[in-house]
Amino acid sequence: AISFPLMNLVLASSEDGRWQVVREGRKVNIIDRTANSCSCSRIFLTYMSGAVFDCSGMVLLLVARGLRAGVFLFRFANGEWQYRGELEPIPHQGVITKRLQKILLRDNRLIFVYNSRIRKYDVETGKLVYNKAVRHAFETEGEDLTQKFKGIYRTGFY
């Protein structure tokens, strides 16, 4: 059998350069570049395709594409990175879909704006706290993370 060396891939860095997310197979490490140490490490069932930090560097979202697609939430609290869970999809619809228009962060809420639906997730727990069908859904207030997410998908969401 042929074995390949494990490829380390940097998925993202925080805006201040302190944090770096490194994928090592299905394992993800959050590296503190100032202390040159691993702050948090987690093994997932699937490979992570990308990562998005908010501008404060306190919220991290990992994105898996493909068969086991999902969005996974980490939060920096009490001096360490903590895994808070997977953002809960609704029946028959994942979190990232081709109808997704905007991703915002405001008042401890991650807001996903679709063509005709708005979903809000609690940044502390990753739980879905608001899910409503809204005609011509429109929301603009908050830190816009949309372009950072689109960078993972290259040509738009799916």
Where are these regions (language model features)?
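Beta-propeller fold detector
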Residues: 39-44, 82-88, 129-136
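Feature marking well-ordered beta-strand scaffolds used for ligand recognition
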Residues: 40, 60-64, 99-100, 132
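Repeated scaffold domains used in trafficking and secretory/extracellular systems
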Residues: 6-12, 44-54, 91-103, 136-158
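Short loop/turn segments that connect beta-strands within beta-propeller blades
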Residues: 33-35, 76-79, 123-125
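Short linear proline/tyrosine/threonine-rich motifs used for host-factor recruitment
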Residues: 20-21, 30, 83, 112, ...
